[in-house]
From Swiss-Prot:
Cofactor dependency: Mg(2+)
SUPFAM superfamilies, per the entry: Carbohydrate phosphatase
Organism: Salmonella typhimurium (strain LT2 / SGSC1412 / ATCC 700720)
Protein name, UniProt field: Fructose-1,6-bisphosphatase class 1
Pfam families named in the record: FBPase, FBPase_C
Entry's Gene Ontology BP terms: fructose 1,6-bisphosphate metabolic process; fructose 6-phosphate metabolic process; fructose metabolic process; gluconeogenesis
Sequence positions that bind Mg(2+) 1: E89, D110, L112
Keyword list, A-Z: Carbohydrate metabolism, Cytoplasm, Hydrolase, Magnesium, Metal-binding
Sequence positions that bind Mg(2+) 2: D110, D113, E275
Chain residues that bind substrate: D113, G114, S115, S116, N206, Y239, Y257, L258, Y259, K269
Location(s) in or outside the cell: Cytoplasm
Enzyme Commission no: 3.1.3.11
Molecular function as annotated in GO: fructose 1,6-bisphosphate 1-phosphatase activity; magnesium ion binding
Length: 332
């Protein structure tokens, strides 16, 4: 049995930018995940369920667990003095860590993805993305350090809190998964160099919004539902409502996750920096593909901290198909 810490140290030689700082940074995220796991598992016993009464910068009502997870991860990262600053879905602006100007890395995170599901005991997750800063070491970080394209990520991953808690990450050398053993207090390696199955047969989208979708996405959904034995259609529809949970299932079973633009969200709804980029990095490392319907996600130059984007991620052939439908059936 190999632990996450042992695995990271063992694989450092595969990573060109390997440093003790990055290893310690991943360990800090691991600690934060353990704390969140512990409290999610007793969420019904303590007063951390439901809405907090506050809103985040996007105008969305924050759940108590959103704020709890944000504070715990922020504290875990700050305590190690290895991160110069963070950007979070739950913070209006970047958070600069005073006294950490010497640190080389910045972290972007969605502390608790799918938190509206927690009240009904459905899987939720944490998403993280790590970059090397671009401003001089020794100075406070600025927004410039965070507004980097996804192809500059040095590591990314997620934690899914479900029937078991699992941490999945990449440093650009494959995707690896670790299951948390609460009796030992460690994450243990369960899958190394994960890959999407050759063919996907599942599509994940909130079909309740069908009438609001672009024409190309509507046509693709109909394509998924048509019978064609040569392409194993119709595909199965599965949608949990938590990006981490839906992505994780599709990574294991094969499939595509779709979150297109709508009239109310013409740029899309998912955040480019906190959700799309890290998941796109993982997808490509697992042999998949991620796109906004027209452009590779990892090549998009971000313009603002909380920028949104349409998002299609999963098996390469399925993302290719949805891109083709979007090209062939443009909106009037």
């Amino acid at each position: 049995m190999k632990t996450l810490g042992e695995f990271i140290v063992e694989k450092q030689h595969e990573f060109s930018q390997a440093t003790g700082e990055l290893t310690a940074l991943l360990s800090a995220i691991k600690l934060g995940a353990k704390i969140i796991h512990r409290d999610i598992n007793k969420a019904g016993l303590v007063d951390i369920l439901g809405a907090s009464g506050a809103e985040n910068v996007q105008g969305e009502v924050q759940q108590k667990l959103d704020l709890f997870a944000n504070e715990k991860l922020k504290a875990a990262l700050k305590a190690r003095d290895i991160v110069a600053g963070i950007a979070s879905e739950e913070e209006d602006e970047i958070v600069v860590f005073e006294g950490c100007e010497h640190a080389k890395y910045v972290v972007l995170m969605d502390p608790l993805d799918g938190s509206s599901n927690i009240d009904v005991n459905v899987s939720v997750g944490t998403i993280f993305s790590i970059y090397r800063r671009v401003t001089p070491v020794g100075t406070p970080v600025t927004e410039e350090d965070f507004l980097q394209p996804g192809n500059k990520q040095v590591a990314a991953g997620y934690v899914v809190y479900g029937s078991s808690t699992m941490l999945v990450y990449t440093t650009g050398c494959g995707v690896h998964a670790f299951t948390y053993d609460p009796s030992l207090g460690v994450f243990c390696l369960c899958q190394e160099r994960m890959r999407f199955p050759e063919k996907g047969k599942t599509y994940s989208i909130n079909e309740g919004n069908y009438i609001k979708f672009p024409n190309g996405v509507k046509k693709y959904i109909k394509f998924c539902q048509e019978e064609d034995s040569s392409t194993s259609r119709p595909y199965t529809s599965r949608y949990i409502g938590s990006l981490v949970a839906d992505f994780h299932r599709n990574l294991l079973k094969g499939g595509i996750y779709l979150y297109p633009s709508t009239a109310s969200h013409p740029q899309g709804k998912l955040r480019l920096l906190y959700e799309c980029n890290p998941m796109a990095f993982l997808a490509e490392q697992a042999g998949g593909k991620a796109s906004d319907g027209k452009e590779r996600i990892l090549d998009i130059i971000p313009e603002s901290l909380h920028q949104r984007r349409s998002f299609f991620v999963g098996n390469r052939h399925m993302v290719d198909d949805v891109e083709r439908f979007i090209r062939e059936y443009p909106d009037a």
